[in-house]
Amino acid sequence: MKRLMISAMASGSGKTVLTCGLLAALTARGHAAQALKCGPDYIDPMFHEKVLGVPSRNLDLFLQGEDGVRRTLLKQKGDYVVVEGAMGFYDGVNGTDRASAWQVARTASLPVVLAIRPGGSSLTLAAQVKGLLTVRAASQIRRLILTACRPALYAHLAPILEQETGLPVLGYLPP
């Protein structure tokens, strides 16, 4: 079973749209996919369920602990498991990284695709990504994808991000 996490720098970055789009694409290609959501969120899993037709579960380190998260992940059936992060990648309980998407990714050894909603920056955006790569050990971030991005902006930003961060940019989702 292949698995990955979709996370972001902050809420409102397009994680749910990206996750649902990926789930729909996998299903359309004949793959059995399962979705999970970090934390105690019960709204986003309803979107996952709508796309897949099967329930989506939560991975919640605060409530389940590390063993519970690993057990939940191992129980999933199918070819792919897509885990959607919550809030910003390092945002956990009470302003700490405890029970954050980063901690879930680290606990479950999940590679992370970071969804980035570009604003009015380019090199500064690369600096923010580099900060995410280094603020904690073993960030698990392996790929980038731009969300709410126009083709011309993608053509400008992708090479900058790849050169400055060393991470491949997979593509973009239009606004």
List each model region and its residues:
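Short hydrophobic alpha-helical runs that function as membrane-insertion/retention elements
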Residues: 112-115, 170-171
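Short, structured patches in soluble enzyme cores that scaffold and shape functional sites
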Residues: 145-149, 173-174
